[in-house]
Amino acid sequence: TETVSHRICNQVYESLVDLDPKKLTVRPALAEKWEVSDDVKTFTFHLRKGVYFHDAPCFPDGKGRELKADDIKYCFDKICEYSPMNQMFWLVQDKIKGANEYYQLSKENKPLPKGGVEGIKVIDDYTLQIDLEFPFAILPTVLTHSAFWIYPKEAFDMYKEDMRVHMVGTGPFKPKKIKEGDAVILTRNEKYWKKDSLGNQLPYLDGIKFTFVHDPEIVFLSFKKGEYDFTGYLSVFSKE
């Protein structure tokens, strides 16, 4: 299901910002801070340094490289591009400068601007600026949507639609084995940038295994026996 897919991908991919699950407020993620212009039409995001993509065959030496502002622009430009794979243009439509024109040109298969979407600008390796058509204070909240997860161009160039089974991100876990409809095994990202409040390296776990079981009775009995640490739902046939 979409919920399960999101739960898995959320361990692999990250955005500029995300939502604090307790406070439900926007907090820094790949961007450590950002500024807003007085007219609330320009947002400037400053990326964390030392954030690396997972090691993957899509890179020339198989080693994940450092995340740069060009990567953010690449992914955000893709959201503004017409494609059967892209169902999320509505999130930026009429909002980011040049987004509508970029989408229309790509839909008509016409040459795209060399600089990409006008309102998505790389200032330097660690700074990205987004220019809007009108004041839009909730832009950071919109950017917490999974459509804005960041991946490297190399991964898209190599895998295209098969990225669903060849995920490459910056998150706390990276794919170890993916068998569609059966199981997904993630392993700890040893190079993950985040630490807890005491300075301990995250994540705490060595790995996560997601198993797909469609029979609710089997799910309940297996969970009861301790075969699973977590399940998204429990069957109502048992009152225990």
Where are these regions (language model features)?
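Gly/Pro-rich hinge or "lid" segments in bacterial periplasmic/extracellular proteins
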Residues: 20-21, 101-127, 131-203, 207-209, ...
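Extracytoplasmic/secreted envelope proteins and their assembly/folding machinery
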Residues: 9-13, 31, 69, 73-77, ...
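A structural "hinge/loop" feature
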Residues: 1-7, 30, 57-61, 87-88, ...
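N-terminal lobe/hinge region of extracytoplasmic solute-binding protein
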Residues: 1-38, 46, 168
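Short, well-ordered beta-strand elements
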Residues: 1, 32, 41-45, 72-75, ...
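Sec-exported extracytoplasmic/periplasmic mature domains
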Residues: 17-21, 49-52, 77-85, 137, ...
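Aromatic- and charge-enriched surface segment that lines or borders ligand/interaction sites
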Residues: 32-91, 129, 213, 219-222
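Paired acidic/hydrophobic, glycine-rich loop segments that form the ligand-binding mouth/hinge
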Residues: 228-235
